[in-house]
Amino acid sequence: MILLENVKKIYKAKSGDVTAVDNANLKIEKGEIFGVIGYSGAGKSSLIRLFNQLEKPTSGQITIANRVISAITGSELRKARQEIGMIFQHFNLLWSRTVRENIEFPLEIAGVDKAKRRKRVDELIHLVGLEGRGDAYPSQLSGGQKQRVGIARALANNPQVLLCDEATSALDPETTDQILDLLLDINKRLGLTIVLITHEMHVIRKICNRVAVMEKGKIVETGPVLDVFRNPKQDITKRFVQQLTDSEDTNETIESLIEKYPDGKVIRLQFIGEAVERPVLQRLMQRSDIEVSILQGNIAQTNNGSYGSLVVHLNGEETAIQQAIEGIHQDQVELEVIAHG
């Protein structure tokens, strides 16, 4: 569906060239929700603007739906852009137009007749949950409602791809989840390919099928979300995953408990998918003559399944502890020893 091949974007500056995107290679399948995560300055905003040619690549090739979009210009490019919707962090609405008029705007530009425009706007208002707000102005809307207008406007021309540029960064956590649920629903209903950029791992966890991690203009890691959670390879990816699996309070609690109970071993168990539902600790206590204390645990739901983490203190004879660890491995649960007694 979307293919980036050796794509590079270099900006000219007085201080010298700035490479915002450095030889990016990506393949995004039709109908998936693909996330790009990175800290500020990683190059993710420059990357997503290459998809619809708001920015032109310095080199490389971008193909969307079998069309090399990086090689077209003029009316052909304008037509191609109608198949690529985009929403923004700060909504970019026309403040002098009502909700209906904002949604209708791209249809006017495309030359759609008035009756068809009215029907399409009605469909979109219903789709994004803005019934009764069609005559309101942006200044009368909440942040979440403004973004719903932005989504409806982006979908007006029935695009194949929806680009989301930090679409939830300006929203509170509850509204963020509501917008993410809406995007997930739209993806399932319409089979729409969604590409989003964010600095929040929560966004990736909640709706993405796959993720690419960017750092200093480079894509340093790519994979299914669950695989990245289970086995992050790069240091930056590990930091993002720890946003969800750890916290400073949790780490301080574990450290204090390790000091309080210096004997035995402290282990971290990671559960992926169906493994979350296995009675691992129950089996452990049934077959081992050791004491088992749970220090910390959490479960996160991703778009591909569940991910769980459990920190446990094992106390007893060294041989019994080792046998218990081997038994956990047999249950196909990933294990890391984080403290030795």
UniProtKB/Swiss-Prot annotation:
The keyword Cell membrane applies. It comes from the Bacteria. It is found in: Cell membrane. Coiled coil: none annotated. Pfam families: ABC_tran (PF00005), NIL (PF09383). InterPro entries: AAA+_ATPase, ABC_transporter-like_ATP-bd, ABC_transporter-like_CS, ACT-like_dom_sf, MetN_ABC, MetN_ABC_transporter-like, NIL_domain, P-loop_NTPase. ATP binds at G38, Y39, S40, G41, A42, G43, K44, S45. SUPFAM superfamilies: ACT-like (SSF55021), P-loop containing nucleoside triphosphate hydrolases (SSF52540). Part of the ABC transporter complex MetNIQ involved in methionine import. Responsible for energy coupling to the transport system. This is Methionine import ATP-binding protein MetN 3. It comes from Bacillus cereus (strain ATCC 14579 / DSM 31 / CCUG 7414 / JCM 2152 / NBRC 15305 / NCIMB 9373 / NCTC 2599 / NRRL B-3711). The lineage of its organism: Bacteria, Bacillati, Bacillota, Bacilli, Bacillales. The gene is metN3.
